[in-house]
């Protein structure tokens, strides 16, 4: 078995990394992203992408979150994130519980939902419904406990302020149609900003 060396990493980067361009934003990433990004951008020709792409991040050397020995797809340049502020990664079960309650969405349906248009509607519904008046009217013990936890409340307030799935839905659909995997469709944790090459 070959031993990994710094030279291997340098060779991988030299062989696979190129300058990517997406809606006027530039980022280094894997050469296999060129075609799907171009295809998605061409699919948007004549449309106004709203909200516009304000952040495009790709190559970030780091392990997969929660691990120390497995490189993330970002470390390999095979994944990118778009507009993270309004498209967060949601991992905490309590966040899903409150989002479901505030929007009247079935919790299990929310976790399993893969349709960008439906998730975008849930995002807007949460922004509209998660208010002080709604929070003060809650009586369910798990919801109350979540709302009283400072860290949880700060995250929820951020979701209400910025949204959870605010990317232009036709753009998400175009990126998926171009063969990319969307993190917003994952059932265990949703990463609405995240797109990656299929393995």
Model region roles, listed by residue range:
Residues 35, 50-51, 60-62, 87, ...:
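Intrinsic-disorder/low-complexity coil detector
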Residues 67-199:
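Catalytic cores and adjacent binding grooves of peptidoglycan-active enzymes
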Residues 46-75:
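Active-site-adjacent substructure of cysteine-protease-like catalytic cores
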Residues 1-54:
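Active-site acidic/histidine clusters and adjacent loop/turn architecture
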